[in-house]
């Protein structure tokens, strides 16, 4: 069998639980030692706490530094208010026209009914019955349309609310995720070759997770700000950012025993 016929075995990254368990800490403790970090402490727990503190700080500061939702300036606020007033005026005008049309129609009908009351009583009764039916059907259609509009609006609002809740749950787990080791692992120089494979996987995994949480925090901040402003389609505005956050969770490097030497 030639060398080219030998399949290249791929080494999957170690399964690292997001739970704060002894195995996870033990894995990272092998590489997070005082001589590998700039923190002036020899206590292992203090060292780990410092790593977690800086990881949390990076995530929190990212929301302020990289918010993609631009604040409304005075001109935009004025234009938004002007647009709302114009829409309100248009709606009032349409309502007034509708009421006037209904009144004119009623007056005309009353006049005709009075004139033909004596010899067209049966026809009038039939007309009244038809009008009543049409009015009832119109009310039903209006109610149905209103329910549909409210449902659509609620679904749009719910999508944003669901996204905010889901994103918060991702960030709530950050205190026990491998991202808390990233600030220390950034300073670790992993050995080259197969001997350093575990170290490089742990390092890349923790850094990718931290970058992901930074991204999710930016995403959450933008959704909340958008919702607080009362803007529409908040979820749709940041779909691309959501996709970026999902992609950031995956370490860029894929590992195999044969390419680890050139890593």
Swiss-Prot record:
Start-end of Basic and acidic residues biased regions: 96-107, 122-131, 139-158
Coiled coil: 72-168
Bias (Basic residues): 83-95, 108-121
Keywords: Coiled coil
Segments for region (Disordered): 76-158
Name recorded for this polypeptide: Uncharacterized protein DDB_G0288629
Biological source species: Dictyostelium discoideum (Social amoeba)
């Amino acid at each position: 069998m030639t060398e080219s016929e030998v399949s290249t075995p791929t080494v999957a990254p170690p399964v690292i639980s997001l739970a704060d368990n002894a195995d996870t800490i033990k894995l990272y403790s092998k590489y997070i030692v005082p001589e590998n970090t700039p923190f002036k402490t020899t206590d292992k727990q203090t060292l780990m706490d410092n790593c977690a503190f800086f990881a949390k700080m990076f995530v929190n500061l990212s929301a302020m530094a990289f918010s993609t939702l631009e604040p409304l300036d005075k001109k935009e606020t004025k234009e938004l208010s002007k647009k709302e007033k114009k829409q309100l005026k248009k709606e009032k005008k349409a309502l007034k026209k509708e009421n006037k049309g209904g009144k004119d129609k009623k007056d005309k009908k009353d006049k005709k009914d009075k004139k033909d009351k004596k010899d067209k009583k049966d026809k009038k009764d039939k007309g009244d019955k038809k009008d009543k039916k049409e009015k009832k059907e119109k009310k039903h259609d209006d109610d149905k349309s209103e329910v549909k509009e409210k449902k659509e609006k609620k679904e749009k609002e719910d999508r944003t609310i669901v996204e905010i809740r889901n994103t918060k749950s991702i960030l709530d787990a950050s205190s026990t995720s491998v991202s808390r080791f990233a600030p220390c692992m950034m300073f670790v120089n992993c050995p080259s070759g197969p001997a350093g494979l575990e170290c490089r996987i742990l390092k890349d995994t923790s850094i990718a997770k931290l970058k992901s949480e930074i991204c999710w925090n930016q995403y959450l901040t933008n959704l909340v700000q958008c919702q607080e402003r009362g803007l529409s389609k908040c979820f749709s505005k940041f779909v691309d950012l959501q996709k970026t956050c999902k992609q950031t969770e995956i370490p860029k490097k894929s590992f195999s025993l044969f390419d680890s030497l050139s890593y």
